[in-house]
Amino acid sequence: MPLVSDRKSKPLLHSNSRAIGFWMSVEGRIPIQPVRVLVSYEALSELDPTNVRDLYGALENFDRFRSQVEKAASRKFDRYGSDPEKYEGMPAIRLTTDDLTW
């Protein structure tokens, strides 16, 4: 099943995993099933290689390309489901450069 956006979800830094995380939910699931999406800094940097490759550049790219990131997350979740590793007991997926350039 695809994921749907949660526009109230603010991006949070996950410095240990060098990623930015935000929440989406499984479409049509009742009760709502949240899924944590982690996007690597490197993947976000590839969305605009002219931007500075640091944390602030990654956050800026997340804000600019959020809809593209959400589409990639939904596509990956729909195809493969969640990752084996959970986030605080909740389903999670991690996006890499390959997921965003597909």
Model-predicted segments: where are they?
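The feature marks short-to-medium sequence segments in extracytoplasmic or secretory-pathway proteins
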Residues: 12-16, 39-41, 55
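Acidic, low-complexity intrinsically disordered segments
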Residues: 3, 50-102
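A short, structured beta-strand/loop element
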Residues: 21-50
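Short, charged/polar N-terminal "headpieces" of proteins
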Residues: 1-32
